């Protein structure tokens, strides 16, 4: 049974990463993609907040939105606004699981990263969710690719 679950998790991850490809990424400097590992489907309507670290080390609201039917969130920012800095992406996983009638362990998923320190890049933040665990990864690419 455990090997069956591991196989399904790996398969979901493979599908997830293959879908996190260049569809909307070429136009968006920051894109978020979320997959529900329990149901093996996109995580729809996950609230996403993006913050930028200020000079005084506080977090300032930068952008927000909800994932679509494909589990993706595009159009969070523009190349002009997405300047070099430290950013935090917060996924409201508790509300997502509560909507499905599941009581989760985590309140939210947080990904903190430095962006554009080596020139302008495209960032895809990907998250694979379950009620008691999560995994994140990032795809960073040159906008000319």
From Swiss-Prot:
Thyroid hormone-binding protein. Probably transports thyroxine from the bloodstream to the brain. The modification 4-carboxyglutamate is found at residue 60. Glycans are attached at residue 116. It comes from the Eukaryota. The gene is TTR. This is Transthyretin. PROSITE patterns: TRANSTHYRETIN_1, TRANSTHYRETIN_2. It is found in: Secreted. L-thyroxine binds at residues 33, 72, 135. SMART domains: TR_THY (SM00095). The modification Phosphoserine is found at residue 70. Sulfonation of the reactive cysteine Cys-28 enhances the stability of the native conformation of TTR, avoiding misassembly of the protein leading to amyloid formation.
């Amino acid at each position: 049974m455990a090997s069956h679950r591991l196989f399904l998790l790996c398969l979901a991850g493979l599908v997830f990463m293959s879908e996190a490809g260049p569809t909307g990424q070429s136009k968006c400097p920051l894109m978020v993609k979320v997959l529900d590992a329990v149901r093996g489907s996109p995580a729809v309507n996950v609230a996403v907040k993006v913050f930028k670290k200020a000079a005084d080390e506080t977090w300032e609201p930068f952008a927000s939105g909800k994932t679509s039917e494909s589990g993706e969130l595009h159009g969070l920012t523009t190349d002009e606004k997405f300047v070099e800095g430290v950013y935090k992406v917060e996924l409201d996983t508790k509300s997502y699981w509560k909507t499905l009638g599941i009581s989760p362990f985590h309140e939210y998923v947080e990904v903190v990263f430095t962006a554009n320190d080596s020139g302008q890049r495209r960032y895809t933040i990907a998250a694979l969710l379950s009620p008691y665990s999560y995994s994140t990864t990032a795809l960073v690419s040159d906008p000319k690719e």
